[in-house]
Regions:
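Transmembrane and membrane-interface helices of multi-pass
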Residues: 1-4
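Short acidic/glycine- and proline-prone juxtamembrane loop motifs at membrane-interface regions
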Residues: 12-19, 70-73
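Transmembrane-embedded, aromatic-rich helix segments that form part
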Residues: 21, 59, 73-94
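Transmembrane alpha-helical segments
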Residues: 23-35, 79-86, 123, 206-214
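Membrane-interface transmembrane helices that cradle and orient dolichyl/undecaprenyl
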Residues: 27-56, 86-95
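Membrane-interface helix-loop-helix junctions at transmembrane boundaries of multi-pass membrane enzymes
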Residues: 44-51, 93-112, 208-223
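Aromatic-rich transmembrane-lumenal/periplasmic boundary elements in polytopic membrane proteins
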Residues: 102-114, 121-175
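Hydrophobic, aromatic-rich transmembrane alpha-helices
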Residues: 185-222
């Protein structure tokens, strides 16, 4: 992140994206640790829930809630985490059935995960609207959250702001058209510009690494 232009720009113009990126990295890191811990617990033949694993999942659930509450970008990351979690659940279930071992722990883990990763983020997201509720003098927190979420959804889905410096979203991964944030003339011969774009060395290499990992998973994954 310290070498990426986009992170540098977004952190300097005080957007929420840097905070959202932090929580997304945190929740994914905690998920990876939790999956590894669950795999070790399962290999030990445990049949009852592991409190250590549940504690890590709860911590991760709070991180997910903070990410979603900071910016809805965290919600998309949460969906990706759900797919990853269910994929591992399915893999463990098939492995236990194949080895003729009880699947009780896998089922329990699935129920715990779905509950924690659904209720905790929703609770944190709901609580994040308390300042808004106090500012409006309202009493129904759920109504404030619902109306605020609908307002944000409608605003971003209906906004149309055409200008010559716009950057189509499909050009972002390749850095084809930098997003111009601000511009101003300084004197007669100088211009001040603020643009958002990624470091091509990192982004282009990241795209190549992404497709390499996809091929590696398909060809060499543990069957």
């Amino acid at each position: 992140l310290s070498m990426d232009f986009m992170h540098f720009t977004l952190s300097r113009i005080a957007t929420l994206d840097s905070l959202a990126a932090f929580f997304i990295l945190l929740m994914i890191t905690l998920l990876i640790y939790g999956l590894k811990l669950a795999d070790r617990v399962l290999a030990e033949g445990r049949k009852a829930p592991s409190m250590k694993l549940v504690a890590w999942m709860i911590l991760d659930g709070f991180a997910v809630g903070m990410g979603v509450s900071t910016k809805w970008t965290g919600f998309y990351a949460m969906l990706a985490m759900a797919v990853c979690f269910l994929f591992f659940i399915g893999t463990w279930f098939r492995k236990q059935k194949k080895n003729r071992k009880p699947v009780r722990y896998v089922v329990t883990l699935c129920i715990e995960g779905l509950g924690i990763y659904s209720l905790l983020p929703l609770g944190v997201y709901l609580l994040s609207f308390i300042p808004q509720m106090k500012a409006e003098g309202a009493r129904n927190l759920w109504e404030v959250m619902w109306n605020g979420s609908l307002y944000m959804l409608n605003f971003h889905s209906e906004i149309v702001f055409k200008h010559p410096y716009e950057s189509p979203w499909y050009t972002w991964p390749l850095d084809l058209v930098p997003l111009m944030d601000a511009g101003d003339f300084i004197g007669e011969d100088k211009v001040s510009l603020i643009a958002t774009f990624g470091n091509p060395l990192i982004w282009w290499a990241g795209i190549a690494a992404f497709f390499y990992l996809i091929c590696r998973v398909v060809r060499k994954r543990d069957r």
